[in-house]
C-alpha cells in the first residue's frame, strides 16, 4: 500500500472527476435521457431541512472546528514579530498547509483514511494586523504537535503626508 498525502489524493480525484465529466459531454444522446440526480450534498441538505426546517449558518460563524477546544492560542507580540500557535498533533506535517492571502493567515489540515476518505480536518484563519509583512510568515512544528506561526512587523515609520501640485496645460 502506498502512502498518499491529502493533496495527492485531491489532485487525483479532481483529475478523474474532471476527465469523466468531459467524457460524459461527448457521450451519446441515449445517456442524456437519464433522469437528473441531485448532488449528494443537496440531498443531505434536503433531508436536514425536512427534519429541522430551514437553517442557515450565520456568516460570522466559522465553517470548520478546531482540532481541539482552544486549538488556537492568543496572538502574542514578541518584539518585531507576532506569534501564535495551533494544536495540530493529530496530523502529519505533510497534511498541514499554511497560506497567506489577502492579509489573512490560514492553517488547514486534512487527514485521510486508507480508503481515501477524510478522517479529520482542521482550519484556522486569522487576519494579520496592518503592520505585518505578509511575505515574512514562517511556521515551525514542535514535537508536542503545536504549530507556531510567526510574522514580522514592518518597522514603525512616521507617516508623512505628501503635498504636491500638478499642473496640466490645455
UniProtKB/Swiss-Prot annotation:
Isoform 1 is highly expressed in adult and fetal heart, skeletal muscle, and at a much lower levels in adipose tissue and in aorta. Undetectable in other tissues. Isoform 2 and isoform 3 are poorly detected in heart. Residues 1-71 are annotated as: Required for localization to SC35 splicing speckles. GO terms for molecular function: filamin binding. Residues 1-39 are annotated as: Disordered. The keyword rRNA processing does not apply. Residues 16-31 have a biased composition (Low complexity). It holds the Pfam family HSP20. Belongs to the small heat shock protein (HSP20) family. Interacts with C-terminal domain of actin-binding protein 280. This is Heat shock protein beta-7.
